[in-house]
């Protein structure tokens, strides 16, 4: 079956920006992740397709090669197999020029393949992001089959020479005037075939397992930051292990919104406090703090508490807490309260220029508009 177009897989246009590609991949990865769709092979296949497409389109060089040469520009094998990730452009097309200029080629590549880097999305609270902490995660990994030790063959048997490529790992294909050598679609470059599959892994050489890891979260991490766990990624065919990248996502906070090192919050105050001034108590990540409200404070006024934000990663100075005032209109008034407010309104109307200059100015503009 022919591979799907990577842009179609991610649902983006061919001129999509890096951010659009990243956003689309995140959405698909969350939707089709195997942990969210257990025992659903279609979802797992969609997840793999999205991951493969993103690995190419998020890399500038691979994307350029794909745009010019299609799938052959990034992965000549064009099919699933023990080789994960993608070779570079020179690997994919180096043999073409050897054929043209008499280099021949045809030697099988080394069988030591690297696996793929893994990604894990982790949600943490704003409080955990602000201070250094440690947590545990449980991740699915593809591990070498202990029964066949990664060969994919039934114990007591050995893989046999691939009948398609004769053990070379590559096949020659004619494309117009060019003779192109591509990775063998049958053995995926190994030069070997499994005649009797291992009963434990069905010939894949790997089995799905789960492992628990401890993740140290540095103080000041922000949305999208990555924590690298070296050697905790995939290991394929005895090759060196890749890495696991834990991607930080911040949970929505009930009070604060983060903007780099600064924190923002709404600060409702009564209209009497706004008019007369006073002192209120506000929450911070370190506890509570006192703030003085000057008389005649209006909705939209912002007060800054220096140093009460978050100290961003790799910086020494913490940000500030920005408190945005919202003057609250009283509700469910008693008759006595209504009476006092009407009395106050009568007094205000006697000198509205002084007591409500913005309202007076606005009404004057309205009158001028309709004249």
Curated annotation (Swiss-Prot):
Gene: dnaJ
UniProt binding sites for Zn(2+) 2: 162, 165, 184, 187
CXXCXGXG motif repeats: 145-152, 162-169, 184-191, 198-205
PANTHER family: CHAPERONE PROTEIN DNAJ, DNAJ HOMOLOG 1, MITOCHONDRIAL-RELATED
Taxonomic lineage from the root: Bacteria, Pseudomonadati, Pseudomonadota, Betaproteobacteria, Nitrosomonadales
Organism this protein belongs to: Methylovorus sp. (strain SS1 / DSM 11726)
General function of this protein: Participates actively in the response to hyperosmotic and heat shock by preventing the aggregation of stress-denatured proteins and by disaggregating proteins, also in an autonomous, DnaK-independent fashion. Unfolded proteins bind initially to DnaJ; upon interaction with the DnaJ-bound protein, DnaK hydrolyzes its bound ATP, resulting in the formation of a stable complex. GrpE releases ADP from DnaK; ATP binding to DnaK triggers the release of the substrate protein, thus completing the reaction cycle.
Predominant place of localization: cytoplasm
Zinc finger (CR-type): 132-210
Family, similarity comment: Belongs to the DnaJ family.
Compartments, record wording: Cytoplasm
Region Disordered, annotated ranges: 31-52
Protein name per Swiss-Prot or TrEMBL: Chaperone protein DnaJ
PROSITE patterns, alphabetized: DNAJ_1 (PS00636), DNAJ_2 (PS50076), ZF_CR (PS51188)
């Amino acid at each position: 079956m022919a591979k799907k177009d990577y842009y179609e897989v991610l649902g983006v246009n061919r001129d999509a920006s890096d951010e659009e590609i990243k956003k689309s991949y995140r959405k698909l990865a969350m939707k089709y992740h195997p942990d969210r769709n257990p025992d659903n092979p279609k979802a797992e296949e969609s997840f793999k397709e999205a991951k493969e497409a993103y690995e190419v389109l998020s890399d500038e060089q691979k994307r350029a090669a794909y745009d010019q040469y299609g799938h052959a520009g990034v992965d000549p094998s064009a099919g699933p197999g023990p080789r994960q990730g993608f070779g570079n452009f020179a690997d994919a097309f180096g043999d073409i020029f050897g054929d043209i200029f008499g280099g021949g080629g045809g030697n099988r590549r080394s069988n030591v393949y690297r696996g793929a880097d893994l990604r894990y999305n982790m949600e943490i609270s704003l409080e955990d992001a602000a201070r250094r902490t440690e947590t545990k995660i449980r991740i699915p990994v593809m591990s070498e089959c202990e029964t066949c030790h990664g060969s994919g063959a039934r114990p007591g048997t050995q893989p046999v020479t691939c009948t398609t490529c004769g053990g070379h790992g590559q096949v020659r294909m004619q494309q117009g005037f060019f003779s192109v050598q591509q990775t063998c679609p049958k053995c995926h470059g190994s030069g070997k075939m499994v005649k009797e599959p291992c009963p434990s892994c069905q010939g894949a050489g790997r089995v799905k397992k789960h492992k628990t890891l401890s993740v140290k979260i540095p103080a000041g991490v922000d949305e999208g930051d990555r924590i690298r766990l070296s050697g905790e990624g995939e290991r394929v065919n005895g090759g060196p292990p890749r890495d696991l990248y834990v991607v930080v996502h911040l949970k929505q906070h009930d009070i604060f919104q983060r903007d780099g090192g600064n924190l923002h919050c709404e600060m409702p105050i009564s209209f009497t406090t706004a008019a007369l001034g006073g002192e209120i108590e506000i929450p911070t990540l370190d506890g509570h703090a006192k703030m003085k409200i000057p008389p005649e404070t209006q909705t939209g006024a912002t007060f800054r508490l220096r140093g009460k934000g978050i100290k961003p990663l790799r910086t020494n100075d913490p940000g500030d807490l920005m408190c945005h005032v919202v003057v609250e209109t009283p509700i469910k008034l008693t008759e006595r309260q209504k009476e006092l407010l009407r009395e106050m309104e009568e007094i205000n109307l006697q000198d509205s220029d002084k007591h409500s200059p913005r309202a007076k100015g606005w009404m004057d503009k309205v009158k001028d508009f309709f004249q």
